[in-house]
Amino acid sequence: RLILTTLALSLIPAQAMAQQCVAAQVDALPKISRPAAEPVKPLAKHPINVYSFVMSWTPSYCAGLKGPLKDPGDKLQCGQDKPPFGLVVHGLWGETDGTNWPQWCATKAPAPTLPQLQKHLCIMPSAATQMHEWKKHGACGPWTSGGAYWQSVARLYAKLKKPDLYKLAKDGRMVSDAVVHAFVDANPMFKDNEKAIQVQTMPAADGSGKVWLKQVHLCFEPKGIEKGSFVPKACPAPSSSELFIIPTLRKPA
């Protein structure tokens, strides 16, 4: 069932998302360790049946940040009057099903280098998050190096046409399923498999009780993904039924 929601705030022109990204220099490789609360889940016990390519919606992420921006990635993504970011990469990870996946796999593959992390800051604004995604997820996949993993991510991001989500709102109202339909219209590869697109929401950070768009998951067959074969496959979890596209962008503190 299609659900209509109210868009209460004024829209920012789509041109604001088209500004050129200028990333600051990354001076040192981020040091990422496995959190104690996250166990190692070896590939042998958690085989990959589908890959999820996940993009986060910048306005919702930035609106949820509190206080001055300290993290370099947050400053790049959220610390400008009109950030050139809409949907940015969260990661590309393998899943066994909707509740299981491999993570923190042991690997001899080298991690991404400093220049490789720098290269991809305009699609994933945080070098630390890039390194985290490689160590937690990419190392469980078929890539021979962290650099190769991020090459695949960048190739897929460039291949996908990102619809202007702001245009989904009309006369102050929007249809939640329009996010899926907009991706299908922009990317014919999903025409026969809309279930390969999953919309994820988050509680509104403003206390309004609404739900905001958090992420869009695009799901693919595992076979050949490291070689640039991107074949849509149904996502292991259904989309959220309702969402609210927040049009405000966080201003510098």
What are these regions (language model features)?
Residues 5-6, 16:
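Cleavable N-terminal signal peptides
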Residues 19-64:
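N-terminal module-boundary/linker segments of secreted carbohydrate-active enzymes
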Residues 1-2:
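Positively charged n-region of N-terminal signal peptides that target proteins for export
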Residues 69-253:
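Domain-level detector of nuclease and nuclease-like folds
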